[in-house]
């Protein structure tokens, strides 16, 4: 493998879910307002999130299986298998909706900021639909990934990969979002985020 550049650690995979599967997840999200929660920090982010609950375990299993296939492809493509932790754990799967209201989006940030999030080593964003705007943008690397049904982006969550969720302009953007994290050390009581 030739010398790897930072942008090479941002991988995009197409067709991880069919358009029909994506539409079904969006419909189920919209049919579950009791499980939705507005997440908002002035000047930083705003979106509606649905954290997977016992009513969504089938979705968590489906997404978990799909992601495990692509996480394997990720570390194989980069030749980092020997550095990949055995038996990584997955943070809860979240479905998110960003409205085209001029407020929803996520300013540049990283996904590891403190002891609680320090177990994260991979970010996964699975887009469920197409919209104008709504790109995941890596400003330091000038890399932009547009939303499309079944498109998956995988990258490290660290300070070398600040990224933004740009606001959608014409319709809501829906994503599935999760992280892989290191398993706790043997004998540790910590479970992670």
Identify the residue ranges that each predicted region occupies.
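Fe(II)/2-oxoglutarate oxygenase catalytic core
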Residues: 1-152, 160-193
